[in-house]
A protein has these predicted regions:
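Short, surface-exposed polybasic/aromatic micro-patch for ligand or macromolecular engagement
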Residues: 1-39
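Hydrophobic, well-ordered beta-alpha structural blocks that scaffold small-molecule cofactor pockets
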Residues: 41-83, 87, 92-94
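Left-handed beta-helix
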Residues: 131, 136-137, 142-143, 147-149, ...
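Short amphipathic alpha-helical segments
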Residues: 60-62, 113-117, 159
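A general structural motif
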Residues: 44, 69-71, 98, 122, ...
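Short, solvent-exposed amphipathic alpha-helical segments in soluble enzyme
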Residues: 30, 63-67, 118-120
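Phosphate-bearing ligand-interacting subdomains
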Residues: 79-134
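Short alpha-helical
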Residues: 21, 54-57, 109-110, 140, ...
């Protein structure tokens, strides 16, 4: 960093700041970055995931990578492990601590059952979309939708609580109903109409 006789730092062709001013601004910027990393997020960004199985863990990793949620915990009836704070029947008990909730259960009927409870209890219901998925900016994505890494979604419509698994493909102009599941490697063709609760199995081509 060059300076002139007055001690002003050279920025391109202009001597605009003293060395001390440059250092002070740099230190202030570094302090702000550190503060942003450690700043507590409000309680409304706590997320409760219903289901701690394989799909639940996938959703957890995506949600964590988004750096949106302050705290992420699970409810599960059969799995014991880290971050599991209670059973699925405890859902209402945690409403005040975890305003956001997501149903991460692969079974379409069971997922729909808990989805109805989230509505009844007035949870905020985010969609969880992996940054590693290829999703059109024109896609219409409902509440509680999970789109996993390497999935591809065109200019399509995904109903509430639908899952598009890794390497699943939903082509443009397709319309999926609520609580559908496009499994790994499954393809929903262009302009297909998919009924609520449909499971498109791995390797299947629908439409």
């Amino acid at each position: 960093m060059g300076v002139n006789a007055d001690g002003r730092a050279r920025y391109r062709s202009v001597y605009a700041q003293t060395r001390e001013e440059v250092i002070a601004k740099r230190q202030a910027a570094e302090a702000e970055i550190l503060a942003a990393k450690t700043r507590k997020r409000p309680t409304e960004f706590n997320l409760l995931i219903i289901g701690a199985g394989t799909h639940g863990r996938d959703v957890y990793e995506i949600a964590r990578s988004l750096h949106v949620f302050r705290k992420i915990s699970f409810l599960d009836d059969s799995v014991q492990g880290e971050n599991i704070i209670g059973r699925c029947s405890d859902l209402l008990k945690y409403r005040s601590q975890y305003p956001c909730a997501f149903v991460a259960i692969g079974d379409n009927k069971l997922r729909r059952r808990y989805a109805e409870l989230l509505r009844e209890y007035n949870f905020l219901i985010p969609s969880i979309v992996s940054p590693a998925a290829n999703v059109s900016g024109m896609a219409q994505i409902g509440d509680g939708v999970a789109i996993l890494p390497l999935a591809r979604v065109g200019d399509a419509e995904l109903g509430d609580f639908t899952i598009v698994a890794s390497n699943g493909v939903v082509n443009s102009s397709a319309v999926l109903g609520k609580c559908c599941h496009v499994d790994c490697g499954a393809i929903v063709k262009k302009e297909a109409r998919v009924k609520d609760g449909t499971w498109v199995k791995s390797g299947e081509i629908l439409g």
